[in-house]
């Protein structure tokens, strides 16, 4: 067994401990189900029956998102079942989904004395995944580090793996143009007292130079010198005031500026490689200074940036609506009834964010659907090709 598989950090491009990631119920694969198995099951159905494509995801929370991606491609000839891999023991995350697919194949090869030397390019996934079985995972940093780790190589080289481009689904749930609608869902108040798009743009621009440094370290597998956890500490808001929202942006900008200066002194010969990476992120990978928030750690963005800001805004809007009810009520009984009714109609911020599907209008979501369409078209071409 490769020593790389025994290194938890090596297979965790985020470099964060399990306790640092959002804890969600996840599972590993069991049995020997593969795309070929599913294709055989499809052939047993009547000729008029739709083909079933199994899409494995990382967690229960991911099922709705990937359903929203794939449902567009269902037709009279195919449909998708989005599900978690089943196992006796719950496991967590993308590594569980991808590594279990590969390790089952290796064990089969060992039993048949056909085991091949361990590869890092993700090709071992091909025999399990296929036109009837795909994997759908969060990109994390694996998309941006371009094969620097084994898991990243699988993301880049496996044709039947779809990923989010953004760090995670949580980032897309925080898609800036959709956040006002979430506020309305929470408060039932459509008064636009805060410009989410502009504020998220400024926040992204403030953290972008330091974000490039973080990716620079992970590309070289020296992330221990500047981990995601270190990066998150620097980009914390340090308090948010609705009366002066620019103040926390300036605070983050100052902290990032100081950290960038320190990194430049630590790596005096890195200027050219840093600038080359910056160009690559913008021109090839779609990361812009204005959209950096989509690529930072998802649960940090969700819990430490977006939810705290929304709490201040929603509190103000709820208070505004309650004052309106008090002014318009004809008597105290009506006021109490209306306030009680309104209170029971407001919603939890985190829950509404998790249900937010405004990301379907984002360019990132369009890229994911384009990948799904390409995969399905190539699969159809392969299936229609004459057998040798």
What are the functions of these language-model segments?
Residues 2-388:
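Acidic, divalent-metal-binding catalytic cores of TOPRIM
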């Amino acid at each position: 067994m490769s020593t790389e598989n025994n290194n938890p950090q090596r297979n965790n491009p985020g470099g964060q401990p399990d306790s640092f990631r959002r804890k969600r119920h996840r599972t590993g694969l069991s049995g020997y189900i593969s795309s070929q198995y599913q294709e055989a099951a499809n052939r047993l159905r009547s000729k008029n029956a739709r083909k079933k494509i199994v899409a494995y995801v990382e967690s229960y929370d991911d099922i709705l998102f990937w359903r929203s991606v794939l449902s567009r491609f269902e037709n009279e000839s195919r449909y998708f079942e989005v599900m978690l891999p089943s196992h006796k023991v719950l496991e967590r995350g993308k590594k569980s989904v991808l590594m279990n697919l590969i390790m089952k194949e290796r064990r089969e090869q060992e039993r048949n004395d056909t085991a091949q030397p361990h590869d890092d390019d993700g090709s071992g996934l091909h025999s399990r995944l296929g036109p009837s079985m795909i994997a759908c995972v969060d990109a994390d940093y694996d998309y941006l580090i371009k094969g620097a780790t084994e898991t990243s190589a699988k993301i880049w080289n496996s044709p039947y793996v779809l990923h989010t481009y953004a760090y995670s689904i949580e980032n897309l749930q925080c898609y800036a143009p959709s956040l006002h609608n979430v506020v309305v869902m929470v408060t039932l108040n459509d008064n636009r007292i805060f410009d989410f798009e502009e504020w998220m743009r400024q926040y992204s621009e403030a953290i972008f130079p330091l974000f490039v440094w973080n990716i620079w370290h992970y590309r070289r597998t020296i992330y221990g010198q500047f981990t995601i956890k270190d990066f998150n500490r620097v980009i914390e808001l340090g308090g948010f005031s609705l009366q002066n929202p620019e103040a926390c942006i300036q605070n983050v900008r100052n902290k990032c500026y100081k950290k960038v200066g320190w990194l430049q002194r630590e790596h005096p010969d890195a200027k050219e490689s840093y600038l080359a990476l910056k160009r690559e992120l913008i021109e090839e990978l779609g990361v812009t200074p204005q959209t950096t928030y989509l690529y930072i750690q998802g649960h940090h963005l969700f819990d430490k940036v977006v939810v705290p800001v929304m709490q201040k805004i929603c509190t103000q809007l709820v208070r505004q609506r309650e004052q309106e009810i008090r002014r318009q009520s004809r008597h105290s009984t009506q006021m109490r009834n209306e306030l009680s009714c309104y209170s029971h109609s407001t919603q939890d911020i985190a829950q509404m964010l998790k249900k937010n599907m405004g990301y379907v209008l984002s360019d990132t979501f369009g890229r994911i659907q384009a990948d799904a369409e390409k995969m399905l078209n190539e699969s159809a071409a392969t299936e229609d090709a004459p057998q040798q």
